[in-house]
Amino acid sequence: MRTLFRTTEFDAFYDSQPDKVKVKLGYAMKVVADIKVLNAKLVKKLVDSDFYELRVSVGNEYRVILFTIDKPNIVESEQILLLN
């Protein structure tokens, strides 16, 4: 449903995480890619911004900044850029 594009900064962040966090981030990215309407616990729009925040909790809270490339709304978007 959605195509996720990863920046080199995101890849560096992802590679530096422990395996448990990588598993949860991978699952969260799959949900973002496959599910049209996303739960606000997982993805939240940042106030007064074009960015969204992907949240994963594994002991600590890990956050990834998302940007919709093709549409202003994440529900309508088919292309998402993973920043960090």
Predicted regions span which residues?
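A short, surface-exposed loop/turn module that caps and links secondary-structure elements
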Residues: K30-G59
